[in-house]
Every structure is written in C-alpha cells, then in structure tokens.
Amino acid sequence: MLGRQRIWWHLLPLLFLPFCLCQDEYMESPQAGGLPPDCSKCCHGDYGFRGYQGPPGPPGPPGIPGNHGNNGNNGATGHEGAKGEKGDKGDLGPRGERGQHGPKGEKGYPGVPPELQIAFMASLATHFSNQNSGIIFSSVETNIGNFFDVMTGRFGAPVSGVYFFTFSMMKHEDVEEVYVYLMHNGNTVFSMYSYETKGKSDTSSNHAVLKLAKGDEVWLRMGNGALHGDHQRFSTFAGFLLFETK
C-alpha cells in the first residue's frame, strides 16, 4: 500500500506537463485566432465582453388555444335608451279559457210592451163591377187581429199609428178603362187608373203610407169600369201597421 502511494506522487507532475507546454508554445508563437490549434481543447482563456443583441427572429407558429375563461361579473346598469318606434301589429293570439260565471245582475227596468200586430190581405176571386161603391173582396188570405171587415171591405184602425197600404187591380177585358180610389174616412187619398182596348186586360197598382187615428177607416171605392177576378187573384188589397203613435 505504501508503495502505490509513492508511485502516484511520482506521476503527479506528469499530469501538468501538457498545460505547461501549451503555455510556452502560445507565448512563443501566438496565432491570429487566439489560442494555438493544439491547445484549443486543453487551454481556456478569460471570459470576453457580452455581445450585442441580435435581430428578432421570425414569428413562431400559433400556439394551442387556451382554456375557456370564467364568466365576468355583471356590468353596471346602462342609461335608459330612447323610445323606439311603434311595432307592427302582432298576430291574433289563441282563444283564452272560458271565465267564471259573474254575479247575478240587478233587476232591470220594465221592458217596452210588444207592439200590436196588425196586417191584412184580401183578393177578388170573382169579377166586380159595382160602380161608385166600396169594393167587396170575395177572399181574405190574411187578417191578423181581425181588423179588416170582410162584409164591408173596410179596415178599421185599432190604435193610432202609421200604416202602409197597397193595392193592385186588373181591368176587365170587356171595358177600356177603370178607376179605383183609396178612401180615408170618406175622403179620397189617391186614385188608380188603367186603360187598354177592349178584349185585353191590364194591371195597375198604387201604395200609400197614412197616419191614422184610432177608429179611422180605410177602403177602396170603385169608379167607372169593371175589375177582373178569378182563382189567380190578380186584384188584391193589403195593409199593415208600421208603428204606433201617441
């Protein structure tokens, strides 16, 4: 063991021999590059000054997208905006559900009494030629209220009011002309006239709206000529109440 230690102590100076040779050679013949080529691997000089910053390199490739961040806090309430324009009318919505029954209403005022129903219509089923007399109609189709007298051919007003009357008469073919008058309490309201040569028939009509008092009478009076009457009822007389008056 002691012998080995002695050998190491004799070899130790040999380890520093290359370094010393490099130093001597460098001192005797320096190169333009600094250290001799044979000592570039075993000799190191002092640190040099820091160099200048080089130009920026090209942009690198895009990085991987980061994770989605958390939602931020609600911002402060903004100022009220200006009033907008009126929008278009929307579509009709669905029908709502049926509501509940409301409370019973109060008792109402007495209603208007129903109007009296008055109407008649008569016709000639046979010829008539009694001049200057009231026309007696052989058939009565309608007589609501029975205010038309079938025996006299006269209508008696049961209430004061406004009445409508109409009549249509066919001239008999044996005469050329015929006159019929609408009478009101013995006074002529208007006339009906029809003319046609013998052998031919002709039909004429007229209408009236009269204000009658209760008890007034209205009828038709025959003038000259003759009227045609048969089952087809060409000659008729009708009237009805429009409304009552006070």
From Swiss-Prot:
InterPro entries: C1q_dom (IPR001073), Collagen (IPR008160), Collagen/C1q_domain (IPR050392), Tumour_necrosis_fac-like_dom (IPR008983). This is Complement C1q tumor necrosis factor-related protein 3. Keywords: Collagen, Secreted, Signal. Residues 113-246 form the C1q domain. Residues 53-112 are annotated as: Disordered. Residues 51-113 form the Collagen-like domain. GO terms for molecular function: identical protein binding. GO terms for biological process: ERK1 and ERK2 cascade; glucose homeostasis; negative regulation of gluconeogenesis; phosphatidylinositol 3-kinase/protein kinase B signal transduction; positive regulation of adiponectin secretion; positive regulation of cytokine production; positive regulation of ERK1 and ERK2 cascade; positive regulation of phosphatidylinositol 3-kinase/protein kinase B signal transduction. Residues 80-107 have a biased composition (Basic and acidic residues). Pfam families: C1q, Collagen. Residues 65-74 have a biased composition (Low complexity). GO terms for cellular component: collagen trimer; extracellular region; extracellular space; protein-containing complex. It is found in: Secreted. Transmembrane segments: none annotated. It comes from Mus musculus.
